[in-house]
Regions:
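C-terminal accessory segments
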Residues: 439-449, 463-530
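Extracellular beta-strand-rich solenoid/capping regions of secreted or surface-exposed proteins
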Residues: 122-140, 147-172, 177-194, 211-227, ...
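Acidic Gly/Asp/Thr-rich repetitive segments characteristic of extracellular carbohydrate-active
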Residues: 77-115, 120, 126, 467-469, ...
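Surface-exposed, flexible coil segments in extracellular/virion-facing regions
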Residues: 19-42, 586
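Solvent-exposed loop segments of extracellular immunoglobulin-like
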Residues: 8-17
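Extracellular/luminal regions of secreted and cell-surface proteins that mediate adhesion/ECM remodeling
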Residues: 533-606
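Right-handed parallel beta-helix
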Residues: 142-143, 167-178, 194-206, 226-245, ...
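Short glycine/acidic-rich loop motifs that flank beta-strands on beta-rich extracellular proteins
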Residues: 124, 150-159, 179-186, 206-217, ...
Length: 606
């Protein structure tokens, strides 16, 4: 509290002595020593009267006493928010009534339950800095499925639920909506809002909204922008939430001079944004885990940025995420897709890490990047599955599994890249413009597109086969190029069933898979899923011809026997006459245990 005088005359040599008393009649006691300034900063903890003794040339005068009432901190305990009841000692009729009760701080942990079915609550709520909060004295809001909604109309106040410097708040099971036609920072944290948790909440921006001021969830350095840098927040956790629509869907931006630490987005659904599914800047140690990113219902579509990491990101852990179904309502769109976008240089020992992610079901006619790592150094991509297999596409643009133009130290191992996308555009499993920077090995680089110029790899020269790529680049010596034979891609199950990618990886420190299943510590599987053939095996009983019998083309037939318990539905066979192998996948077999069948190659042997 600041004490000062108004209406007094000022002269040389005056001194000021502030005094306090519990009653207006005194006695008053001095607060510290006298000063030549009339301004005094004090901490007021109880209600008292204050006056100032002004002395000039030995003469003293007293100011009129002023009563300063100090409200006590809000007591810890359990409370309710219920619009059907008036605000009282234990209930608050609105969220703002609850917020106002915290203005003088808290004296203990607070739990407030929004009574089920008591909403919706149509109000704009901004919590500020709350004294007394700590890791023990927390504030918990249990939404119980209620809706907090607001239609912002001005750029200076675009939020519905705002945490302005608020710490140690937990919000559970609350739906928050922004319905403004231009402004909708639905849930927005800024100004050093730290140590907050949002669990099982839903944050909705307007359907098909395109304004850059529409962001379902944001942490930034500005009251009015979801993507501005500055003092934003650290150690915030968003878990089990759904973020819907927006221009940006989920944005976390720190301070350019001191990046934010400890922010996490875990097991969330990030849906139907116009442009950026995520937008991360100036973060150290960001965790982005177990999230599903898609655009299943949005009808107006633009360029798709999935996981976007740019300036100031180091030590990011991006794992177990699924990016899929991003052009569901317009598969003929020619907009570009950047599934994972990273344009930042980390440093040695502070690499950004990408593991156990699945990119699939990208049904469009535009250029597609699985990993877009433009000018990005010091990163690691392990055990990712990239399936760019939309055979109905007519794309003329390029398709990339990995697009990498960094010049220092990046590592691509144990990944599956399968491309059978239609269209006449050029395709690459891996594209390294500075190959000396790349460690690339133990990958499945499968190319089976029906049209276009199709390449396994690029290092300044394009190579159409794995053997040529290995010889020409010196990369991927232990890699394979086989159809992964995904178990059920129609239901997003991209577990391989091809034994040639089983146990074919190398240990890189990723000890579990996308589902949390433990990986082999010596021979992990390629791709995001650790799997076992588990009673699935076949033997070759016989094949013909076994030797040249006469000149001319001959059909090679192989008799396959199911030697294990599981039914064999598909199998991949190959033969070679000393040149490039002829590979064919046979599907729809239905070969049960103990039975055999004849399989004939369509490409004849000469």
């Amino acid at each position: 509290m600041v004490l000062s005088l108004t209406g007094n005359s000022v002269g040389s040599g005056q001194t000021y002595q502030w005094q306090e008393s519990t009653t207006i009649g005194g006695p008053f006691t001095n607060i510290g020593a006298s000063s030549n300034s009339s301004v005094l900063n004090i901490l007021a903890s109880t209600t008292k009267y204050y006056q100032c003794e002004v002395t000039c040339s030995g003469n003293s005068q007293l100011s009129t006493p002023v009563l300063v009432t100090v409200n006590p901190s809000f007591p810890g305990g359990n409370y309710t928010i219920n619009s059907a009841l008036p605000t009282s000692g234990s209930n608050f009729q609105t969220f703002n009534d609850f917020k106002n009760a915290l203005n003088c701080g808290i004296a203990g942990a607070i739990v407030v339950n929004v009574v089920a079915g008591s909403g919706p609550y149509n109000e704009q709520v901004e919590f500020g800095e709350i004294t007394g909060v700590s890791s023990v004295n927390t504030i918990t809001i249990n939404g119980n499925g209620n809706v907090l909604t607001y239609g912002a109309t001005v750029s200076t106040a675009p939020g519905t639920l705002v945490l302005n410097g608020t710490d140690y708040m937990t919000v559970n099971n609350l739906t928050v909506e922004g319905t403004g036609t231009t402004y909708a920072l639905v849930c927005h944290l800024w100004n050093n809002a730290d140590n907050n948790t949002f669990s099982n909440c839903t944050f909705n921006a307007p359907v098909n909204g395109t304004s850059t001021s529409m962001v379902p969830f944001s942490i930034s350095g500005s009251a009015t922008s979801g993507t501005a840098s500055g003092n934003s927040g650290i150690n915030n956790v968003i878990t089990g939430c759904t973020m819907f629509s927006g221009y940006y869907n989920t944005a976390i931006v720190g301070n350019s001079s001191l990046p934010s630490t400890g922010n996490q987005v875990i097991n969330c659904n990030i849906l139907d944004q116009y442009n950026y599914a995520t937008y991360f800047l100036y973060q150290n140690g960001l965790v982005f885990r177990g999230n599903t990113l898609s655009r299943p219902t949005r009808t107006n579509l633009s360029t798709y940025y999935g996981i976007y990491l740019s300036t100031g990101n180091t030590n990011a852990l991006v794992e177990r995420n699924k990016i899929r179904n991003t052009f569901a309502t317009n598969p003929t769109s020619t907009s570009i897709q950047y599934s994972i976008y990273c344009t930042i240089d980390a440093t040695l020992g502070n690499e950004n890490k990408f593991s156990n992610n699945v990119i699939s079901d990208i049904n469009s006619n535009g250029t597609v990047y699985g990993f877009y790592m433009s000018g990005s150094d010091y990163w690691k991509a392990y055990h990712n599955t990239i399936s760019l297999d939309d055979a109905s596409s007519t794309a003329t643009g390029t398709t990339y599994g990995f697009y990498c133009t960094g010049s220092l130290a990046y590592d691509v191992r144990n990944n599956i890249v399968s491309i059978s996308r239609g269209g006449t555009g050029t395709k690459y499993d891996v594209y390294y413009s500075n190959p000396s920077a790349a460690t690339s090995d133990y990958n499945d680089l499968y190319m089976n597109a029906s049209a276009g110029t199709n390449n396994i790899g690029y290092n300044g020269t394009a190579y159409t086969t794995l053997a040529a790529w290995q010889s020409g680049s010196g990369k991927d010596a232990n890699s394979v190029s086989v159809d992964p034979l995904y178990v059920a891609p129609g239901t997003y199950d991209y577990t391989p069933s091809n034994g040639l990618v089983n146990d074919a990886g190398t240990p890189v420190g990723v000890t579990d898979d996308i589902n949390g299943a433990p990986r082999s510590l010596t021979s992990p599987d390629m791709g995001a899923y650790e799997f076992s053939l588990g009673g699935l095996d076949a033997g070759i009983t016989w094949f013909t011809p076994t030797s040249p019998s006469s000149p001319g083309l001959k059909t090679i037939t192989v008799n396959i026997d199911n030697t294990q318990a599981q039914t064999i539905n598909s199998i991949q066979l190959s033969y070679s006459d000393g040149g490039a192998p002829v590979v064919q996948t046979f599907t729809g077999l239905g070969l049960t245990s103990g039975n055999n069948t004849n399989l004939s190659f369509t490409t004849q042997y000469n």
